[in-house]
Amino acid sequence: MEDSEGTDGTDEDGCRAGGWFHVEAIITHGQSQVSSDEDEDETETREDLDFIDNRVPGDGQEVPLQLYAQQIAQDDEATVQALKRKFVASPLSACSCIENDLSPRLDAISLNRKSEKAKRRLFETEPPDSGYGNTQMVVGTPEEVTGEDNSQGGRPVDVREEERQGGDGEADLTVHTPQSGTDAAGSVLTLLKSSNLKATLLSKFKELYGVGYYELVRQFKSSRTACADWVVCAFRVYYAVAEGIKQLIQPHTQYAHIQIQTSSWGMVVFMLLRYNCAKNRDTVSKNMSMLLNIPEKHMLIEPPKLRSTPAALYWYKTSMGNGSEVYGETPEWIVRQTLIGHSMEDEQFKLSVMVQYAYDHDITDESALAFEYAQLADVDANAAAFLNSNCQAKYLKDAVTMCRHYKRAEREQMSMSQWITFRGSKISEEGDWKPIVKFLRHQGVEFVSFLAAFKSFLKGVPKKNCIVFYGPADTGKSYFCMSLLQFLGGAVISYANSSSHFWLQPLADSKIGLLDDATAQCWTYIDTYLRNLLDGNPFSIDRKHKTLLQIKCPPLMITTNINPLEEDRWKYLRSRVTLFKFTNPFPFASPGEPLYPINNANWKCFFQRSWSRLDLNSPEDQEDNGNTGEPFRCVPGDVARTV
């Protein structure tokens, strides 16, 4: 059959044309023939009159026209459906495309299909918008949009509108690859798509400033550690914000050293900041993210190296150039390591100064002394020299050992009245002696008899050196004894450690002792081995890694639920102990609040009130006997030499 003249309107071409047919009529005629369109002089015939629809509405011919319109609509819908079936990807193809977007390398080594759940894309190739208004962008990988005709394979390009709140300024560190097929930006895209974003930022920093970031800072593993000085490097900052940060940062800081560089990523802001108060990394990150209008992941934030001379010289030299903006007073750690006068002021560590500090603050624990003394490095030259030393552990141990020797010698030289005065001088609060007396009366203890026994107890009279408080549980025996022990700075021994040879060693370094909650087995042990201890006579104590020590037992208090006088097996202890019975439950004014509070201030007032009745020496008598009252000093004084 001979082909029809005009355009070949196949279904495929029709679909490509969007569902419309453009048919050209080719008419051949001789030169002598004239077409009806060209014959302008010919008069109109009756057939031409039907071209104009001049029928009267309502004559019954509307139904065929509506039917014809419906047929045309059905044909158009069928054409659209054919287009959809041709270009919409199949489920398998769509899943593979999603997995390819997630990780092309991972998809290349995959042996089977992965999960069909939609996942977040790791690598986006959309160009970052300006942040203002609605932005229409084309989403698709470079492989999907290659070619001149979008209908030639691949997935369709998804055109969408992204509504963004203008002015957020958040720009991603990804670069849109041009679709020209060139590899000019391929290396940059590969670098930015690396999984370790921090390594990428560190590499860019060294490229811009010529020095490693970690050569200027020290690392804080915890983001909750507070520090006043911070080094901040922010990437991809807008130009206007980078220029305005010089003014925006001033209300928050005392000192700022700001350097601004231009790179392929945009503006890079490098700052050394000293805040008005100490802040942690999380707080600094949120503050800088708000001021610079960038996400927190685009910043490197660490504290500076305070004892590194090269780092201090870097900040000092860059502050003198025209590429830095500096305001505020230079931090002392930079001044100390860069100026000659301050460098010569560094002195050697003196152990005696550290020992004096431990003695004055009553620190006999190595950990506590190390923590407290290290905090003085900014204001004390000897503490700074201690931190700069490589023998901190040795100095610390020696200082605590010497402090204990001084404290022990001072305690042994004091009488009980001097010791009570010394302990009372450490308490500045004013108390009341009445709660102690009321508590003893509440337990049925006669106050006069208690004072008489307490007087002999403090003097260490033989056979009167031990006081026992016994009675039912929850009567306040331990509460009463612990409060007195805390005021006098005594020691506690426990029968649970009786299997050790050294369980009595704490009594050698105290003026008073306490054995809490003695059981029947404990009383049997005391009756067997510790009769001489209850007498108040000298006895021998075994100390760890030291020779035996012969001392007089300090006054000892014992709390128990058993009356040792009622047991015949302990009859030899009856003359060695003084008993007071607590019978009534401990009174409370409210839950957790005792009715009769007994604290250090109340014990101080109690001893001042009953000083003469306890036959204690007055402070005036102590000064007359040679006690000058001057504080102990182990640091040699400076001698003024005349020229």
Swiss-Prot record:
Modification(s) after translation: Phosphorylated.
Domain SF3 helicase positions: 445-595
Gene Ontology biological process: DNA replication
Source lineage: Viruses, Monodnaviria, Shotokuvirae, Cossaviricota, Papovaviricetes
Self-association and partners: Can form hexamers. Interacts with E2 protein; this interaction increases E1 DNA binding specificity. Interacts with host DNA polymerase subunit POLA2. Interacts with host single stranded DNA-binding protein RPA1. Interacts with host TOP1; this interaction stimulates the enzymatic activity of TOP1.
Function as written in the Swiss-Prot or TrEMBL entry: ATP-dependent DNA 3'-5' helicase required for initiation of viral DNA replication. It forms a complex with the viral E2 protein. The E1-E2 complex binds to the replication origin which contains binding sites for both proteins. During the initial step, a dimer of E1 interacts with a dimer of protein E2 leading to a complex that binds the viral origin of replication with high specificity. Then, a second dimer of E1 displaces the E2 dimer in an ATP-dependent manner to form the E1 tetramer.
Stretches for region Disordered: 28-60, 119-179
Motif (Nuclear localization signal): 84-86
Name under which the protein is recorded: Replication protein E1
Phosphoserine modification, residue list: 90, 103
Keywords tagged on the record: ATP-binding, DNA replication, DNA-binding, Early protein, Helicase, Host nucleus, Hydrolase, Isomerase, Isopeptide bond, Nucleotide-binding, Phosphoprotein, Ubl conjugation
Annotated region (DNA-binding region), positions in chain: 180-346
Entry's family note: Belongs to the papillomaviridae E1 protein family.
GO molecular function annotation: ATP binding; ATP hydrolysis activity; DNA binding; DNA helicase activity
Binding site for ATP: 471-478
Subcellular location(s) per record: Host nucleus
Enzyme superclass (EC): isomerase
Signal peptide positions on this chain: none
The protein's Enzyme Commission number: 5.6.2.4
